[in-house]
Amino acid sequence: LNPDVLLFKDTIDNLINEAKQLRNFAIISSISDNKEFPNFSIKKKRHIDYKKNFEVDCVDGYCMLINKKKIKSMFKDNIFFDEKIFMYLENDDLCKRVKEQNEKIFIVPTSKIKHLGARGVSNNFHSEVELSRNWHWSWSKFYYSKKHKGYLYALAEGLPKLVSSMIKFFFYCIIFKKFKSKVYYNRALGLINSMLNRSSWYRPKID
């Protein structure tokens, strides 16, 4: 549970009660109250009955209840989250590995949450956090694609994004938009580091 998540009165109780009822699950999650940005994904579109628990392919990492016993039986090395990923897509990676083991992931509609996201960050640190977010998103996206689809696929997917980021970086430099230029510079830098198999080393400067 991330610190930028707000709970409703029965969020935890309903989630735990449903976990006891379901039993046969690897991961379950509460449901976001923001329907425009759901905290789950389903590969094959289908009608969803929001009055009962439903199975999904992936849930966002800011609220997950893991069936530790089942997960440990699946991953003998006891590595749940990929520790090479500092930020972004670690939940996608875990969910993908869970589904590859034919295990189940559920959303519990009676357990609601509100995700604040960037709104949970102090204005004093907003710029540094935004730069960090852009760096790590680019790094993690390439790493995830490389891990699950291969280096060449990740490269073909990443090179156009690298070119786009560099063009935007130079454009914003020319028109003296300093912060915007830094954003796209960090996007490019995160991607380049991932392409070169370097670690996700970047950290925001919030001293």
Please give the residue ranges for each predicted region:
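Conserved donor NDP-sugar-binding/catalytic core segment of glycosyltransferases
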Residues: 5-40
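A short, conserved alpha-helix in the catalytic core of glycosyltransferases
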Residues: 58-75, 79-112
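Short glycine/proline- and charge-enriched loop/turn segments
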Residues: 44-51, 77-79, 119-128
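Hydrophobic/aromatic residue at the end of a short beta strand that borders the catalytic acidic motif
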Residues: 1, 5-11, 66, 81
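Short, flexible, basic/aromatic active-site loop/helix in glycosyltransferases
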Residues: 30, 34-65, 69-70
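Generic structural signal for small/hydrophobic residues in well-ordered secondary structure
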Residues: 2-3, 28, 67, 98, ...
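Non-catalytic, C-terminal membrane-associated alpha-helical segments of glycosyltransferases
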Residues: 132-140, 151-207
